[in-house]
Amino acid sequence: GILNETSKQKFTDLQSKGASQIAKLATECGVKTFVHFSAIGADINSHSKYLKSKAEGEEMVKASFKNAVILRPSIVFGAEDQFFNRFATMAKLSPLIPLVGGETKFQPVYVDDIAKAAVKGVLGEAKRGIYELGGPQAASFKELIIMLMGIIRRKRAIVNIPFFAASIQGGIFDALQKFSLGLFTNTILTRDQVIALKKDNVTSKNKMGFKNLGIVPTAMETILGEYLYRHRPYGQYTELTEAARDLDS
């Protein structure tokens, strides 16, 4: 799927119609198991085009492939993730970290755990239905950024942006993308993302999850430092530098 629309890539085309076409082809080819990746928050009635398209994709997949296993992860962390790495890079370039929806809760999930769930689905070891996948810890957006700053050893001012102001900013960036004839792609903030950020991104009690798959989710603290160290002031040598500084003092 995609997180941002462009002139050539639309949520509906990829995440709704695209998912439907793949499921139909799988059925026609006699595929026995089908695993579809969606997202927590998928809702056919959502005002977010992203979340609505995810829900539409789920329904279309289920219509074509009755025994489909649908995985809905929260935000994903891992070596090349687009969440922690993005804000860590921002912290290296700016003294301020702007946040939209600082109190919105997330339940970050390790990419390897999602892979394990997918494997169980492919091997027929998961019963059909929707699985919401979240890590063992839920935290607010702001709490996650504070934790990140501690890991990368950087102190930055966190600025909360009200939803109404963020919606205006997102609308401006969206307009720039629309009228720039492809010269600008809005990867900063979209109005649709602002809408999605108004709702917590955590697992539901009435949905299946890792427990039903026999998987114990991995805690963030055991993984984040393994790849985010490169964003520290002295990279992998930061701890040595800090230790030497302590000896001098």
Language model features by range: what are they?
Residues F164-S249:
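A hydrophobic C-terminal alpha-helical subdomain
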Residues G18-Q21, Q82-F83, G101-L123, G129-G135, ...:
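Substrate-positioning beta->alpha
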Residues F11-S16, V35, K54, Q107:
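Short alpha-helix in the Rossmann-fold core of NAD(P)-dependent oxidoreductases
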Residues A88-G101:
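A short C-terminal helix-loop "cap" of Rossmann-like NAD(P)-dependent dehydrogenase/epimerase domains
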Residues K105-D112, Y131-I151, N160-G171, V216-T218:
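Substrate-binding strand-loop-helix patch
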Residues S38, E58-Q82, T89:
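Conserved beta-loop-beta element that borders a ligand/cofactor-binding pocket
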Residues G1-E28, I40-I44:
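NAD(P)H-binding glycine-rich loop region in Rossmannoid oxidoreductase-like domains
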Residues E5, I40-K52, V76-D81:
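Conserved catalytic-site region of short-chain dehydrogenase/reductase
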